[in-house]
Amino acid sequence: MDVIEALRTRRSTKGFSPTPVTPDALLELVDIARHSPSGANKNAWRFVIVTQRAALDRLSQAHPHCRWLATAQAGIALVVDPAATRNWLEDCCVAAYSIWLAAVGRGLGVAWAAMYQAGDPQESQRRQAHVREVLSIPEGINVPMVMGVGYPQS
């Protein structure tokens, strides 16, 4: 699939089949994201790959609009130290979209669950604290989104 087709056919997948995603496929998605552009070429993002069912179940409880994470075969949390770059949110969004398009090109489905809410700082803090606890991410590190990855349900 070429990039234009991936852009046109990309959809949010919130129903996943039980077919597992290989570790190599997940690593490829993260590797592609590492090549994403970032402000001042800071590349401050980091990626946490989640494959444990219990962790995915707990992540799905971060807020009501991400319950579908419990059906994903894997998750990729984008994390960043906000002190490293003032463009941390934009940079993470670009990297997340790179993951998304690469996943579509590999026949995988993806959706992202927003953990950062610019208009509601308290809700943003609550969601991110939940994810940090589940994934043992230190305080002060932002988690703008968690992406669910898997093969779409037919």
Name the predicted role of every residue range.
Residues 1-154:
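Acidic, surface-exposed loops and disordered segments
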